[in-house]
Amino acid sequence: PSTIDCTGLYVSPGFIDTHTHGGGGCDFMDGDVESILTAARLHLHHGTTTIFPTTLTSSNEDLFLCIDNFKKARGITENMPHLAGMHLEGPYFSPTEKGAQNEDYIRTPSPEDYMHIYEYADGCISRWSVAPELSGAMEMGDRLSKLGVLMSIGHTAATCDDVKEAIQHGYTHLTHFYSGMSTITRKNGYRILGVIEAGYLFDELSVEIISDGMHLPPDLLKMILKCKDNNKISLITDSMRGAGAGEGKSILGSLKEGQEVIIEDGIAKMPDRTCFAGSVCTTDRCVRTLYKLAGTSLENAVRMMSLNPAKLMKIDDHKGSIAAGKDADLLVFDDDVNIKQIFVGGKEIK
C-alpha cells in the first residue's frame, strides 16, 4: 500500500449531498445520461462522494425519463460519486409556497399517481419531498415511509398542527429549512405556528440547510445551530445547473421545460429578482461557509455534510465516517476546505 503525506492537511469522510439538481451546466432532468454524469462529476471534484440526484415538479413523462437515465448512470462508476438514490422534490406541493417549482404540474397526491411513480422507479427513490397539508398526503406518508422512503416536508403552507400529524404518518424531515415553508401567521389576533417553528419544537424532526451564506444569512445559520440539535442538521447544496459554471443567464429545471434564471452574487435568482431559484453551491463551499460564518467547528460542519446525511438516508453502516469496514470515501483538504485529494471506494479521483 502507498503512503500519502497529508502533513498540515485534514482528512475527512467524503461529503454526502441529499438535495442537488445539477451542476457544471447540466441538470439531472435534462433527459440524457451524459448530463447526469457531467453534473455528478462536477460535484465529485468539489468533494461530493455520495449524491442523491433531485428532480423538480414536472410531467410524469419527464420524470420517468429522468428515472431511466438515473438507472443507466448508476451503472457507470468510473470517475463518479456514488449515485445512492433519487430525491423527488414534487410534484405534491402547495401552490402558495411553490418557489421556483413549475405550477403547471403541481398537484395533490393520489395513490394511483405516486405508486405508479414509485413502482416505475423500481427501488431508486430514496426520498420524497411533499406538502403534508394536501389531501392524500398523510396516506402517502404512511405508505411510502413503510417502503423505506424518507418522507420530507417541503414547499408547504402547513401549520404546526399539520406537521404534528404528519410526524404520526411517517414524515421525519424538513426540506431546505426556512425556504418554501410557512411561519407564524395571525388569525383574529391569535398566533398560529408554521412549519419553521415545528422544526424547532419537534426534536424528532431533522432539518437540512442550504449553507451557501445567501439563502440563510450568517446570523440565521448561527440561530439554527444554537436552537436545533446539531446531530439533526444536514447541509445541502440544493444546487441547480449553474453550480461551478459562472455568472449570467441559466435555466432552472430541464432544458425543455425549465425556466430562465439569472446567476449573480453567487446565487441563482428569478429574472425579476424577487426570489432565489436554487443555489450554485458545492459541498466544499457549504462546509467552508458554515465553518467560517456560523462560528462552528470545522469538525461539526464536516459532520453535517457527511455523517448526519448518512444517518438521515440510513446509509451510515457504510458511509459518513472514517471507520474500519466502511467505504473508503475520503477527502484531503486545507484549512479553507480547498479540496486537495478525493477518494471514492479507496480509489483516488484524478
PLM features per residue range, with description:
Residues 18, 28-81, 105-120, 299-302:
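Alpha-helical scaffold segments that flank or form the walls of functional sites
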Residues 41-52, 95-122, 165-206, 246-277:
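Active-site gating loops and adjacent loop-to-helix segments of metal-dependent hydrolytic enzymes
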Residues 1-12:
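Histidine-rich, glycine-flanked metal-binding segment
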Residues 8, 19, 43, 88, ...:
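Conserved, mostly hydrophobic/aromatic
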Residues 13-27, 90, 154-156:
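Histidine-centered catalytic micro-motifs
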Residues 115, 119-247:
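Active-site core of metal-dependent hydrolases
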Residues 191-209, 225-237, 242-332:
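His/Asp/Glu-enriched, well-ordered alpha-helical/loop segment
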Residues 21, 37-66, 81-94, 121-133, ...:
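Divalent metal-dependent hydrolysis catalytic cores, especially in the metallo-beta-lactamase
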